[in-house]
């Protein structure tokens, strides 16, 4: 029996090794047959040969899933770690969309809408509309990029022709709207648009080019206020969600507003669409892949879920909750502890003011990647391999909210490029390259930011500022500028007289005029006299400028706080750098610190406005005094006697 089982095992192994044709299989069957015949003649030899169980073949290691041509796809996505340009609105920007007709449309909290045109490199301003008298609740662009609409708390819907950048219709809704979406596809007779009532689950369908009379009303489809309405133009179906976590499929006028017939399910229990209701969450953003087969969502529980549209089955879940980020920071530090704490505070404020609902998710043109904003920056996730392949803007001091993705070549040429043109070495044709761009909004910012494949320092002129001031200053800003005394109030050098010696400082009034003015005026007025170095960290920095000595006090010469003044030539790249202390973005008061080592992680977070030119040994002596390990406060006070401004 041992011989037979051994022969069978050997035969099976030979068959696995020779998967080709039947001839090899027959040959491998003959060989063990001879071995059996020989073993009958010599049993002793056979017993020695087949003693014990045969070794099991090693199982093949599971191959890691790989997306073919992933590098090519990533080359068509923005890759710069910092934003290249930013442009302004008068108020906080809340919404941004990108159309297939190469337009970018931004909307701000004060009801204003701006149209921008994507050009070969960058964008250009087109037109400005005062769209609503109040807050804009939602905006939408049609699937072919021809029509744009916005709804606001003035109970109105405004409809725009995108290509001609003109307002073509205005609908008086008679209720406070919540969400809106174009639900028609190219070729439909009616340009239908859906709008939901903010406080109920009703959905009203209108003719976008018609009057105020609704074509249809869904009054029983949802029982809770809606959070999203999105059209899947490939399958001509609409998906809507409400605050109870329910997700519904329906169609527009061509299919008489019924359940779509082209999906592979009839009862919702056969799908995973109850996932949100089970988790007591609801979708705050929904988008479809270009082929219409995937639905990407962001939930109120900060989880990214990806479903298959036709079956409603859950495909992927990515946890982006604050507890996950805290655990990740503890396992492997993602950010300096001080910066991580600041960003966590911003995240909690997001939840407090219910701004998480403005964060959205988008697919790229291939449908293999999703992009969305997190506290670490813009994540690019490969949904096929389940990996985060890129993070943009990690070192930026902004919390990305809504984003829109442009891919391709903006400038349309008269004739399509042939294979011969593509293969040629014509330098003119080679200059026509794609300019993938992410346009995003930020929390509490009146700017939108553009991430491309170019870093800020790669721009044509080294002196060009990436933050473009395309809006006129407000009356308050003009008054503050005219009241300032100008050059008399600032200086380019000062001497800090401390109880341990003098520190000579060079100031930078040209690069950061407001910060230097604040320091000089405070110094001349004797504000810093008697202030202690209330926080000293050996091998890092010494901090002062707080009249209370607790680290919680101090204000600017204008009262309250003032904005950051970052400059590309002023970095924390060397010791003895003079920089402003703050409690977050644009919260400068009177406190400042002097570093004793290079601290590059503070760049673009704290304003550098001076360098120590003499008295470095005094700074070192102060940094080496004994301090309370819990509070970093010296046991014996080291104080500023006064500051002489030259």
From Swiss-Prot:
The keyword Repeat applies. Its main location: nucleus. GO terms for cellular component: catalytic step 2 spliceosome; nuclear body. SUPFAM superfamilies: Cyclophilin-like, WD40 repeat-like. The keyword Isomerase applies. Residues 1-50 are annotated as: Disordered. WD repeats lie at residues 88-126, 131-170, 221-260, 278-319. GO terms for molecular function: peptidyl-prolyl cis-trans isomerase activity. Inhibited by cyclosporin A (CsA). It catalyses: [protein]-peptidylproline (omega=180) = [protein]-peptidylproline (omega=0). Keywords: Acetylation, Isomerase, mRNA processing, mRNA splicing, Nucleus, Repeat, Rotamase, Spliceosome, WD repeat. GO terms for biological process: mRNA processing; RNA splicing. Disulfide bonds: none annotated. It comes from the Eukaryota. Residues 17-32 have a biased composition (Basic and acidic residues). It is an enzyme of class 5 (isomerase). It is found in: Nucleus. The modification N-acetylalanine is found at residue 2. Residues 490-645 form the PPIase cyclophilin-type domain. Its EC number is 5.2.1.8. PPIase that catalyzes the cis-trans isomerization of proline imidic peptide bonds in oligopeptides and may therefore assist protein folding. May be involved in pre-mRNA splicing. Belongs to the cyclophilin-type PPIase family. PPIL1 subfamily. Identified in the spliceosome C complex. This is Peptidylprolyl isomerase domain and WD repeat-containing protein 1. The gene is Ppwd1.
């Amino acid at each position: 029996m041992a011989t037979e089982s051994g022969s069978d095992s050997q035969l099976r192994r030979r068959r696995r090794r020779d998967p080709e044709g039947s001839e090899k299989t027959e040959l491998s069957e003959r060989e063990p047959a001879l071995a059996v015949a020989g073993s009958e003649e010599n049993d002793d030899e056979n017993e020695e040969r087949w003693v014990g169980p045969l070794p099991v073949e090693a199982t093949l290691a599971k191959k890691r899933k790989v997306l073919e041509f992933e590098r090519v796809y990533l080359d068509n996505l923005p890759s710069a770690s910092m934003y290249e340009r930013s442009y302004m609105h008068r108020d906080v920007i809340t919404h941004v969309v990108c159309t297939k007709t190469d337009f970018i449309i931004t909307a701000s909290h004060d009801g204003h809408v701006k149209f921008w045109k994507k050009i070969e490199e960058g964008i250009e301003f087109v037109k400005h509309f005062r769209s609503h008298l109040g807050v804009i609740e939602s905006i939408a662009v049609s699937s072919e990029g021809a029509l744009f609409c916005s709804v606001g708390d003035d109970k109105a819907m405004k409809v725009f022709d995108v290509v001609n950048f003109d307002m073509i219709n205005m609908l008086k809704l008679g209720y406070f709207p919540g969400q809106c979406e174009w639900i028609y596809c190219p070729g439909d007779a009616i340009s239908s648009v859906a709008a939901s009532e903010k406080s109920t689950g009703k959905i009203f369908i209108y003719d976008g080019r018609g009057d105020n009379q609704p074509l249809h009303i869904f009054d029983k489809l949802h029982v809770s206020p809606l959070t999203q309405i999105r059209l899947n133009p490939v399958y001509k179906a609409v998906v809507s969600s409400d605050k109870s976590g329910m997700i519904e499929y329906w169609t527009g006028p061509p299919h008489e507003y019924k359940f779509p017939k082209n999906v592979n399910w009839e009862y919702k229990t056969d799908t995973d669409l109850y996932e949100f209701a089970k988790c007591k969450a609801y979708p705050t953003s929904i988008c479809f892949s270009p082929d219409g087969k995937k639905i990407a969502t962001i939930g109120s529980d900060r989880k990214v879920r990806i479903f298959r549209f036709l079956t409603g089955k859950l495909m992927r879940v990515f946890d982006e909750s604050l507890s996950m980020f805290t655990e990740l920071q503890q396992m492997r530090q993602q950010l300096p502890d001080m910066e991580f704490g600041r960003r966590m505070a911003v995240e909690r404020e997001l939840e407090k003011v219910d701004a998480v609902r403005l964060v959205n998710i988008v697919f790229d043109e291939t449908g293999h990647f999703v992009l969305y904003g997190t506290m670490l920056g813009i994540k690019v996730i490969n949904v096929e391999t389940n990996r985060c392949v890129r993070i943009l803007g990690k070192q930026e001091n902004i919390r990305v909210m809504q984003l829109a993705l442009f891919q391709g070549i903006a400038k349309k040429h008269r004739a399509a490029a042939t294979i011969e043109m593509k293969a040629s070495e014509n330098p003119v044709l080679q200059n026509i390259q794609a300019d993938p761009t992410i346009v995003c909004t930020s929390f509490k910012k009146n700017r939108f930011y553009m991430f491309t494949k170019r870093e800020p320092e790669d721009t044509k002129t080294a002196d060009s500022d990436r933050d473009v001031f395309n809006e006129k200053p407000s009356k308050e800003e003009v008054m503050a500028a005219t009241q300032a005394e100008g050059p008399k109030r600032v200086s380019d050098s000062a001497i800090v007289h401390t109880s341990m010696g003098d520190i000579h400082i060079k100031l930078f009034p040209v690069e950061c005029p407001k910060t230097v003015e604040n320091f000089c005026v405070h110094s001349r007025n004797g504000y810093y006299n008697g202030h202690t170095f209330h926080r000293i960290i050996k091998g890092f920095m010494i901090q002062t400028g707080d009249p209370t000595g607790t680290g919680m006090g101090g204000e600017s010469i204008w009262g309250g706080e003032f904005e950051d003044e970052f400059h590309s030539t002023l970095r924390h790249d060397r010791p003895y750098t003079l920089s402003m202390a703050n409690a977050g973005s644009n919260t400068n008061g009177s406190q400042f610190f002097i570093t004793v080592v290079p601290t590059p992680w503070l760049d673009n977070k704290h304003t550098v406005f001076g360098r120590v030119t003499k008295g470095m040994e005094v700074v070192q002596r102060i940094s080496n005094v004994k301090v309370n390990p819990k509070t970093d406060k010296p046991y014996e006070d080291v104080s500023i006697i006064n500051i002489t401004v030259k």
